[in-house]
A protein has these predicted regions:
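Bacterial N-terminal signal peptides
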Residues: 11-21
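Bacterial N-terminal signal peptides that target proteins for export
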Residues: 2-11
């Protein structure tokens, strides 16, 4: 996925997060209120390539909101091409400051099980050097951990992953996926397709 396209998509992503995640405790619907339409509450735009806390902004593919802390979590899927795979934290209060863009409060490098940043395709060496294609991110309030997905590096044999990380980006564990998420090419092609596997993630 291209850097610019995802930065433009930030408008829709943030708007959806406000609607679905909620910035305040949801009100109980009154009797007879069945209007379940999604409404645009606010929008913001941060241009691709803008330097944010020492990193180039862009490739934002996932976002989640923690109503207890009032903090947003965002993840970049630029495959470590412009900076190591990373997550951002942000604050945004469009109801109080409708003209103000989100305030990016932190950036954290996602780390491998060995405690190293994920390499870019150019930096990758060896069969075990995974290049992630991060897509979704969710805050697990009960565990105080982040869950994030990677579609894998198909051209180099990488497979989809579901991972748990500490809020500062350190690896916590890989969460096993069903065998159907492991692609095979021989004797016939089975499993997910490139750029079409773990796009989203939700708790239920």
């Amino acid at each position: 996925m291209r850097l610019l396209r995802h930065s433009r998509a930030l408008v829709a992503t943030l708007a959806a997060a406000l609607v679905l995640g909620g910035c305040a405790a949801p009100r109980q619907p009154s009797a007879g209120n069945t209007d379940a339409r999604i409404r645009l509450l606010a929008q913001a735009h941060i241009a691709a390539g803008t330097e944010v806390l020492g990193t180039p902004w862009g490739g934002i593919s996932g976002i989640d909101y923690d109503p207890q802390s009032g903090q947003f979590w965002l993840i970049s899927d630029d495959r470590s091409a412009h900076a190591p795979a990373r997550i951002y934290t942000a604050r945004w209060s469009p109801a109080q400051q409708p003209t103000q863009p989100p305030h990016i409060t932190g950036v954290f490098t996602l780390l491998t099980e060995q405690g190293q940043p994920f390499p870019s395709p150019r930096q990758r060496t060896g069969s075990n050097a995974e290049v992630p294609d991060a897509e979704a991110i969710r805050w697990h309030a009960g565990r105080q951990r982040l869950w994030w997905t990677s579609e894998g590096d198909w051209a180099r044999g990488g497979i989809p992953r579901l991972r748990e990380a500490l809020p500062t980006g350190q690896w916590a564990r890989d969460i096993p996926l069903p065998p159907a998420f492991t692609p095979t090419l021989q004797p016939q092609r089975t499993g997910p397709r490139p750029n079409a596997s773990l796009e989203g993630l939700a708790f239920s």
